Amino acid sequence: MKHGSLFSGIGGFDLAAEWMGWENIFHCEFEEYKQQKLKENFQKSDSYGDIRNFDSRKYKYKIDIISGGFPCQDVSIAQQSKKLGGAQGINGERTGLWKEYARVIREIEPGIIVFENSPMLLIRGFERVLCDLHKLGFDVEWRCFFASDFGYPHFRKRLYGVAYSRFKRWKDIAKSGGILSKVLPKRTPRQIPISIPLERFNSQSSYDNVRMDDGFSKELDKTVIHGFGNAVIPEIPYQIFKAIEQYETNRHTQAAQAGRTARAIP
């Protein structure tokens, strides 16, 4: 599989693709620190900055899967208390960059898109995402996952969506039961007590405890923490990618069986 990521952060989707043995073709990230980490960790990938300046037409028909979590600031709960009119939703300056995500999809025409965002997107502009993807020829499924569902010691509820082309080899995914229904294990780790001692991360006193050993400024430390705080948990896209690849394996198996059956008919 050939994979490209948008709004790549520090590379959660890219790492999951690497775990799968897929080829990371490109990543696209605006923030300098995150872009630096991407270049360090995925040196064979093409690297791009501001998505608004990303001309993706060179990748047309060359990418199987595009992934990424477009900005959620304008739909998140945190925006409700701000003085700028509250959450602006899909029309906001940051979350509104979805239109660039859609543009890249239109230019590249991949088979599958995997995206991530705040669950609040469901009531603050998700219909725009669905409408745009439908116009581009994709069917969409979506589901909210908790980090704790995958054994992590925090909840962090996030929305994940998988869109697949109605005109390519993935067009029958819906008939097979979809992708996201196959992601979670039967037993949910969220219900299992976690034996990791956790302290409440609180205010300045706690912040001082996570300063770097090399003596860099707190502002740089803050950038590092921000990078990890906004990152997707790689295990979640990894499980989604595994379900996608399993569909591919099943499709090839069924095609081979059908071929053998056809040859056996006198």
Walk through the language-model features, giving the residues of each.
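Conserved active-site and SAM-binding loop architecture
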Residues: 1-266
